[in-house]
Every structure is written in C-alpha cells, then in structure tokens.
Amino acid sequence: MTANASREPSTAVLSDIAPDSGRKLTSTEKWRFGVGFVLFSLIWMVAGTSGSAVLLPQRFTELNIGMPEVILGTMNSVGCVFALFSNVIFGALSDITRSRFGKRTPWIVAGGLITAAGYVLAFSSAQLVGIVAGWCIVQVGVNMMIAPAVAVLSDRIPENVRGTFSAFYGGAQIVGSSAGTFLGSKFIENMGTGFAIGAALFAVTGIVTVLIWPRERSSAASVASVESSDATAKLDVKQLLRSFIPPTKNCRDFYLALMGRLLLILGWNMISGYQLYILQKYCGLSVKDSAATISTMSVISMVVLIVTSMVSGPLSDRLQRRKVIVAIGSVIIAIGVAIPCFMPNALGMMLFAGIGGAGYGIYIAVDQALNVDVLPSQEE
C-alpha cells in the first residue's frame, strides 16, 4: 500500500480546514462553492453535449461532405489530442499564474470565451478542416476552464467535504449532459438557434462561476520572490515542461485511477457520443423518432443521475471510502452499456440511459475526489 493510498482507510481523519485560508469554510462559503461547481459543470455540459451529441452529428449528415460517422470520429479524435495537452498546459500555467484576481480565475473566464468562439467556427464551417479546427479550439477553451476549476477542489475545499463537492461537480456534469442532449433534440430541425444558445452558454460559464464562488485570493504578491521578468519566464517554462513528466514516486494508486477512468470513459462514450447514429443506423429509427427517443433518454438519465450522484458523494465522505463506490458504479455502467447489444431498439437504449446513467452518477460523483486524493503531490 502506497503512502497516498493511506488517505482512504476509515481510521484516517479527514481535515475540515480549507487549504488556501487555513480555516473552516462558513456555511455561506460552502453554499457558494457548491452552487458554483454545479453551475460550472451544468452550463458547459449543456452547451457541449447539445452540439457534440446531437446538433453537429445531424449537421454532418445534412452537409453531405462525406460519411458523417467518419467526420464525427475525426473531429473527436483530433479534439482529444488538443484536450489532453491543453488540460496539462493550462493546469500548469494556472499553478504559476500571478494576478490580483488569483491564479485560477483568469483562466476560467478566458476559457469560456475562447470555447464560444471555437463553437461558432465549428458550426459555421461547411468543410471538414474548418469543423475540426473549430472543435479543437473548443477543446482548448474547455480545458482552459476545467483544469483550473478542478484544481479548486484541492486548493480551496477541505478534505472532509471533498467528496460532496466532487458530487456537485460530477453530478451536475452528467445532468448537464442529459439536459444537453434533450436541448439538442429540440433544435434538431432549427440548428442555428440551438448553436447560438450553445455559444452563449459557453461564453458565460466561467463568468458566472467565478462570480458565485467566494473571491479567490490575489496571487500577485508571489511575484516579489522573482527577481526579474526573465527569471519568471524561465520558471514558467521549467514548471510547464515538468508537468509532462509522469510521476514515479508514491504513484501506484494514481495510475490505477488514471487507467480506470480512461477505460470507463472510453466505453461510456462509445455509446453516448454516437447515440444519434446508433438510433438511426443501428436501431433503424427516423430523424424525428431518434430525436424523440433522445429526449426520453435524457429525462430518464437526468432523474437517475441526480439521485445517485447526490447520494454517493456525501456517502463517500461519511464512510471515508472512494474506491469501493467507484467500483460499484463501474459495474452498473457495464451492465447498462451491454443492454443495446442484445436489444437493438429504442427500449434497449432507454434501459441503457436508466441503468448506465445510474452507474455513471455513482461513479462520476466520487471519481474526481478519488483522483485528488491519490495525487502523488497534493501541491501540484
């Protein structure tokens, strides 16, 4: 058992002190953080999923510039590469950012605006190159928001309620995903309006979040320890490059969590990311029936996700257990994902939404807290 794994046993006492302030959070601060995490995940996921799961796939079909499945796969594949590097880069840059607004806030706000710009480009382009370029900008902007926002969990949230706030973040993310597919299905025949709503939601995500959260402390004072702007630049490059070096000490649980999340998200998105095409080409539904089925699936998954995520997060804090809850959620997801293989119809997809959604709510509500707990270095 590694040192970072020692956080999980029931004998451990999780701290109730906020790392950034060295004191307990007030009730008002807890509510502000909770609402901020919920709205952050909810808003950007509604915008992103309405486009990526419904509107863009349908637009690819109507553009008639190639096989829509190939276009969607190309967009997602290239976008994943940009997302991976952007998350690491902007996470590292936010760690060393010095401003009177703090080190996370500027990136969260700027990320939302950049995401909106990329979303407009992806929708307005009628060629594959423009679509992919726009989506890559979306991934850069989204991760410019996500990396610093998730870091707030370890920066400012006490250990003893981290599972609860992870539930706020994760639960709202999945509810936002369901709400996004529902929204997209309602604009499948009026895509211009749907994309305009999505772009507006992206633009306000970061602004709304930082206005609701308790104001981040200024990080500008740290500049005094740096002798010159040249030294600052060298420090930035050195720390940025160090961010790409995989950890080698006290990292067993970190890599287990990383691989587990990678495999689970891969399996989940093989269904949820292509659900419009699955309904149309695997289940044989029309565009209208596919939209109606997606709406129903969204409502089903939204209900079960709210219930399971809001229960599993606080439960993990009370039990001081993360791994067992994540494992249970993963098994339930696997059962849900398997159903459409044996029931290639609308009912099978609805059962996937209900059973798989319940498991995903359990998993995602606790997974982020687990990832923070098993970091080899809590300061990075």
Spans of model-derived segments:
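Juxtamembrane intracellular "pre-TM" segments in multi-pass secondary transporters
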Residues: 8-31, 216-259
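Helix-loop boundary and gating motifs at the non-cytosolic
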Residues: 18-80, 253-285, 297
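Intracellular juxtamembrane helix-capping segments at the cytosolic ends
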Residues: 56, 144-157, 362-377
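Glycine-rich segments within core transmembrane alpha-helices of 12-TM secondary carriers
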Residues: 79-84, 163-185
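Helix-to-loop junctions at the C-terminal end of transmembrane segments
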Residues: 85-101, 308-321
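Structural signature of the two symmetry-related core transmembrane helices
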Residues: 104-120, 324-339
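Symmetry-related core transmembrane helices of the 12-TM Major Facilitator Superfamily/SLC fold
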Residues: 110, 193-211
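Helix-loop junctions at membrane interfaces in 12-TM secondary transporters
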Residues: 121-134, 341-352
